[in-house]
């Protein structure tokens, strides 16, 4: 069936901000869908609230709306654009839920819009737990024994049937949100209450426990003519009980016999037919009991998912692109496989001659109070994938690509300590983020594979593979370097051992080991990912390293530029940096360079095989990058676009003779090294907050006395404000030095005077060495002290005078030229009174670059990449700062709901996972839309509770006056109420939590409050008010912890609920006029 001609325009729903469970894989799928549909001649309309995505680039769709993915906003877009069809399968759970809302509210029917890719009934059948259960029984497949509950009474009735432990999963949520495993009644009630609260349909599925069962996934694609292919089978290394997004996974499945594989293959096809997925990709999850072989279907997703991004990258088969084309009527046999250059049709099942391992990346260090045990609710924030010829090789490559300080199966436990045995037992029994390293330690301690299997449920096959690696390590430890000959070195490298790990085992430096290996002439070769196990030729350069005979890299002799990506997502380094890498690749390819991407994150657009000319799917370690450089001999390497990951390699790459283009590693060091930075600030006669670098506790106490409290304290060289705190007095400083960091000569601690009540600013600029152009000045809404990645910001600034902005421009230009920046640079400044302080300078791509580029209609990352390759800003015609004639607000999105027990207060340590953008004619409108995009519901009336610290009291009466004018009743604690009453306003007093009942938390629990403005300072007051913030989060009450955000909310509420939607392309056209 060729493509449909009865539809002309298609609306694609994006996935919105990055949250745990829904990350950049949906930017990857959405961007592919946009490209696929436009090349077929359709008009594409896109809605996505996340500005850091490639899919929201104005060139990706015909009409782009950076608007909230809520049915109300999308309805306005449908009314304006009149699309013929909507494609909801590319934007994760967010898009599916939005599509179902549009259907339910009659919007699709009213405007005659058809749902393609999956219809409402299919989505409902797959997502509604009771319908899915019945559908599986109809085709003779088993689901886990389970029951459905819509209330606590029903839940208790199901529990009677199933007993403990049981697994609770809310309907229509993703990443297992709100679910969990209950081992006793108390846990059961807590999880069920939370689950009923979070499920949009107030429905829970309560399952028998399958903990310890083996878990598999099948990635399936089906078309209208019932052609089905399995793209890839995926096996979970961790058994059931750990969410698949948090499991180590391996593709293809390693421990199935062919017969078992065929049974599962047939079952997954039957599931797609029964649910009615006719066009596109789905994944089906299975559990198998290791003792009896009983197989159950756990769930299916009728959409492109996290696993399909992994399967696409693992096989080279572009699932999202194919799914988009099937949705418009094509069949698999009509579509060509790009990787083989059209030599095979898309109906060929991919076959692969290598092993892929995915490891999750966690961020528990950011949330010390979070429960770090892994259960059925997803907690990881990113992932890394590695390709090798054997499981051992791909596992060890993935371990070093994860960037958690391990270069392989490094030891975690001191086996000589008396606690060792009990630590190992606990870590093996209850899975945590680092279980695989504990498994290795258990093997070192003499535990047998059987004993480990009994504690972990990890398949014996995997354990035997790991045991072999540990035995090999023990052998290497006994040898001298000279004893390792060419054959033995090859054997070790084929098992995936890194130079660094071998050097540690031999007690020598990495450099010496690498020299020895090169002397033996042991080098990796590069193999191609070609979807067909080398049966057909491929022109696509999608490569991975391994130690074999034949190298398939065939590098060209063109001028090449290599871009180092950011590795796995984590808090503080996410999709924004990937966006910059993609833009660099696109710009330099346009300019005639051959572009080479090195990265290991399977979720991203940068690791798509057609983003750059050549893709090396390799860990970002010195060894791996140097080997790629050895083969490719690039003319220049860009290290400034992938966040801290490639920057950490800059110096060592330079020493090894790799040509780094753009800002020099020495200039980067001048900006990062405190003492060198201070000299520069003084030389330019600029201001910075009084500060000191200390190397012992005594020194710290002395320095603190002369700088004056409050202080910002942190270890040097960190990204995302790791272990950063504000301390208000001596005892707090001592506690920080004791508990949070080990201060020493090698790891100094930085003290800065904290600028209380200051307005923070962020500036992005491009410099070519002689000219500097400001990309944008952004004003933070939260005052200084909140990490810049967590603060909302406004572009242009909404309350800074022209004089202040001009002075900022002068200072930024001075610093760019003094540092010799070539490329991008980001500066953070603070305004206190009438003084401007420089807080920090980063001569690299920052996380605000995508947001700024969307606001000013010009890609800073592209311009800067061209500058790094030798162009001047004058040649590029970018000489003038572009100041938008509309307001844009960027708002951060947080994962607090996933981590009960964590305080949702903002501070100097970054905690957000993603961002959204709101656009409006006024600051208030833009802020209101950003809140809506972040799924924060702004109250329109009711009772506002206000309690602020002394420093905020001068502003509090103004906020109260606004709220009363907007129809709110104001309640406040004694100190705050006094100030409001003094201004002649009506206020009701309420007890603080520490002053006896009824207090404010009682009001929250009784749903008597609709808005909370609660600001604190100092450890004690933060601890006292913790229950206010946590309860507000549980009761979904809008709560802000800064007075500045309180003022912004008043602006947003004045704007009122009537929304207009704006095309990005129209906004940009207005800037050029």
UniProtKB/Swiss-Prot annotation:
Mn(2+) 2 binds at residues 299, 301. One of its GO terms (cellular component) is cytoplasm. ATP 1 binds at residues 129, 169, 175-176, 208, 210, 215, 241-243, 285, 299. Keywords: Amino-acid biosynthesis, Arginine biosynthesis, ATP-binding, Ligase, Magnesium, Manganese, Metal-binding, Nucleotide-binding, Pyrimidine biosynthesis, Repeat. CDD domains: MGS_CPS_II. Mg(2+) 1 binds at residues 285, 299. Residues 936-1073 are annotated as: Allosteric domain. This is Carbamoyl phosphate synthase large chain.
């Amino acid at each position: 069936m060729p493509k449909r001609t009865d539809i002309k325009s298609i609306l694609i729903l994006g996935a919105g901000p990055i949250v745990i469970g829904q990350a950049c894989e949906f930017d990857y799928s959405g961007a592919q869908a946009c490209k696929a549909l436009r090349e077929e001649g359709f008009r594409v309309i896109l809605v996505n609230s996340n500005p850091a995505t490639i899919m929201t680039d104005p060139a990706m769709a015909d009409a782009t709306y950076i608007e909230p993915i809520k049915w109300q906003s999308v309805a306005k877009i449908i009314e304006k654009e009149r699309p013929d069809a909507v494609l909801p399968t590319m934007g994760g759970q967010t898009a599916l839920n939005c599509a179902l809302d549009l259907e339910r509210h009659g919007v699709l029917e009213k405007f005659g819009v058809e749902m393609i890719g999956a219809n409402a009934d299919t989505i409902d059948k797959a997502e509604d737990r009771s319908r899915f259960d019945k559908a599986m029984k109809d085709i003779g497949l088993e689901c886990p024994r389970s029951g459905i509950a819509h209330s606590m009474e029903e839940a208790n009735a199901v529990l009677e049937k199933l007993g403990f432990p049981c697994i609770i999963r809310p309907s229509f949520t993703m990443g297992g949100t709100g679910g969990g495993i209950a081992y006793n009644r108390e846990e059961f009630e807590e999880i069920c209450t939370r689950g009923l609260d979070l499920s949009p349909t107030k429905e829970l599925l309560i399952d028998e426990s399958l903990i310890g069962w083996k878990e598999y996934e099948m990635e399936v694609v089906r078309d209208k003519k019932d052609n089905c292919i399995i793209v890839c089978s995926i096996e979970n290394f961790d058994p059931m009980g750990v969410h698949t997004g948090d499991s180590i996974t391996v593709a293809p499945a390693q421990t199935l016999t062919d017969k078992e594989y065929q049974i599962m293959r047939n079952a997954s096809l039957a599931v797609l037919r029964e649910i009615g997925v006719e066009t596109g990709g789905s994944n089906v999850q299975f559990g198998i009991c290791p003792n009896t072989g009983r197989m159950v279907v756990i769930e299916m997703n009728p959409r492109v998912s996290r696993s399909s991004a992994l399967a696409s990258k693992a096989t080279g088969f572009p699932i999202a692109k194919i799914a988009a084309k099937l949705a418009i009527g094509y069949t698999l046999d009509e579509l060509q496989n790009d990787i083989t250059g059209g030599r095979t049709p898309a109906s060929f099942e991919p076959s692969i001659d290598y092993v892929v391992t995915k490891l999750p990346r966690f961020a528990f260090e950011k949330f010390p109070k979070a429960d770090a045990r892994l259960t059925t609710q997803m907690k990881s924030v990113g992932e890394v994938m590695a390709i090798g010829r054997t499981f051992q090789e791909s596992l060890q490559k993935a371990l070093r690509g994860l960037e958690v300080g391990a270069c392989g199966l490094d030891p975690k436990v001191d086996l000589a300590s008396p606690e060792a045995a009990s630590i190992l037992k606990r870590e093996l029994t209850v899975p945590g983020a680092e279980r695989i390293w504990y498994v290795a330690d258990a093997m070192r301690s003499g535990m047998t594979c059987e004993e480990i299997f009994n504690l972990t449920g990890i398949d014996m096959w995997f354990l035997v593979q790991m045991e072999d690696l540990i035995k090999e390590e023990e052998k290497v430890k006994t040898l001298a370097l000279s004893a390792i000959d060419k054959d033995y070195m090859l054997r070790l490298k084929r098992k995936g051992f890194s130079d660094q790990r071998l050097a540690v085992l031999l007690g020598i430096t990495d450099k010496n080991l690498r020299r020895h290996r090169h002397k033996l002439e042991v080098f990796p070769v590069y193999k191609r990912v070609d979807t067909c196990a080398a049966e057909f030729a491929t022109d696509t350069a999608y490569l991975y390293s391994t130690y074999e005979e034949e190298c398939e890299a065939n590098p060209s002799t063109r001028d090449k530029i290599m871009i180092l990506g950011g590795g796995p997502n984590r808090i503080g380094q996410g999709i924004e940096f990937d966006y910059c890498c993609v833009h660099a690749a696109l710009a330099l390819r346009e300019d005639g360079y051959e572009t080479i991407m090195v990265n290991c994150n399977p979720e991203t657009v940068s690791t798509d095989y057609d983003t750059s000319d050549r893709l090396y799917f390799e860990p970002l370690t010195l060894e791996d990058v140097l080997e790629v450089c050895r083969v490719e001999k690039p003319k220049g390497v860009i290290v400034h676009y992938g966040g801290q990951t490639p920057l950490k390699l800059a110096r060592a790459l330079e020493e090894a003779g790799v040509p780094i283009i753009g800002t020099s590693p020495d200039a980067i060091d001048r900006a990062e090294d405190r003492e060198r930075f201070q000299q520069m600030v003084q030389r330019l006669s600029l201001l910075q907050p009084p500060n000191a670098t200390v190397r012992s506790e005594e020194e710290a106490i002395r320095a603190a006395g002369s700088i004056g409290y409050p202080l910002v304290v942190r270890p040097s060289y960190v990204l995302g404000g790791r272990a950063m705190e504000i301390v208000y007095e001596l005892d707090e400083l001592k506690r920080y030095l004791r508990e949070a960091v080990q201060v020493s000569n090698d790891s100094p601690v930085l003290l800065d005077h904290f600028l209380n009540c200051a307005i923070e600013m962020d500036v992005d600029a491009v410099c070519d060495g002689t000219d500097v152009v400001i990309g944008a000045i952004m004003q933070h809404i939260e005052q200084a002290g909140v990490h810049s990645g967590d603060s909302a910001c406004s572009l242009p600034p909404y309350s800074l005078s022209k004089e202040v902005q001009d002075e900022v421009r002068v200072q930024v230009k001075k610093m760019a030229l003094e540092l010799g920046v070539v490329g991008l640079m980001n500066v953070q400044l603070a305004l206190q009174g009438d003084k401007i302080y420089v807080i920090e300078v980063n001569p690299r791509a920052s996380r605000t670059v995508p947001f700024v580029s969307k606001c000013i209609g010009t890609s800073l990352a592209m311009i800067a990449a061209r500058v790094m390759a030798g162009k001047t800003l004058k040649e590029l015609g970018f000489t003038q700062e572009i100041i938008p004639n509309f307001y844009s607000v960027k708002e951060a999105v947080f994962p607090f709901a996933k981590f009960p027990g964590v305080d949702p207060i903002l501070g100097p340590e970054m905690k957000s996972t993603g961002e959204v953008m709101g656009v409006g004619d006024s600051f208030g409108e833009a802020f209101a839309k950003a809140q809506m995009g972040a799924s924060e519901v702004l109250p329109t009336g009711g009772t506002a509770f206000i309690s602020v610290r002394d420093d905020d009291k001068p502003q509090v009466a103004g906020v109260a006056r606004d709220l009363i004018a907007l129809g709110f009743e104001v309640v406040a604690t004694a100190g705050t109420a006094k100030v409001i009453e003094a201004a002649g306003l009506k206020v009701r007093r309420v007890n603080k939590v520490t002053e006896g009942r009824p207090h404010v938390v009682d009001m929250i629990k009784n749903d008597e409050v609709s808005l909370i403005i609660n600001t604190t300072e100092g450890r004690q007051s933060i601890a006292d008010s913790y229950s206010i913030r946590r309860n507000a989060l549980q009761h979904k009450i809008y709560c802000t912890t800064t007075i500045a955000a309180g003022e912004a909310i008043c602006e947003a509420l004045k704007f009122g609920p009537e929304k207009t939607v704006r095309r990005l392309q129209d906004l940009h056209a207005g800037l050029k006029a």
